[in-house]
Amino acid sequence: DLTLIPYHGEHYADEKEIIRSQPKSGTTHFHGYASVSIVHDNQRFVVALRFVEKGESMQEIVAWLFDRLKSIGISIKRAYLDKGFCSVPVLKTLQRRKIKFIMPMPVRGKSGGVRKLFEASASYKTTYIFNSPKHGELKVSAVAVKKYSKGRYQRKGTRWFAYAVAGLPKAVEPHQVFELYRQRFGIETSYRQMNQVRARTTSRNPVIRLLLVGLAFILFNLY
């Protein structure tokens, strides 16, 4: 996952230390951190962490994280990635490494694109072709899930979800994909708890700030 922590100040040694994004906590400047959380024996652990610089691509970040897992001897059964990683370069990286995954497909615009998957009457499995002017086309397996919930979703109590997937057993039904992906929601809890225990500093040094984030995740793991 990728998280941005608001930063009020100037860069320490290089402008790449600061990422600009949507305003939060009175600033558009952030320090970025990428991490990997795993679930083992029904317990969640953060096992990899790195600082993210301005201009780094999602593909670079994902490749580094999986290389890190390999270097420390951790193998994964399936990766659950945030929709922010859903792009042709990242998907190609996952396919090339033969990684099984479930990843939401971002829905943009009012028609066309991923929204075409929502024209059916019920959930189903299909394929989808991503088109990138820079990185070309890529065909992936996809699952469209129609969820019903009284008073929870708009549009007469229904809402569609779309996922790019790889390596799913044939017996897995679309609604099960939705439930499987919900397993990653605990990542948000880990970041929230990390921020609760993270020591604050006035230092502009990104190495020190990365250390404090890492120590906070260690406390989370121990807890």
Whereabouts are the PLM-identified features?
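An anionic, glycine-rich sequence signature occurring as long contiguous blocks
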Residues: R97-T189, Q193-M194
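A short acidic (Asp/Glu
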Residues: G9-H11, S87-L94, G112-K116
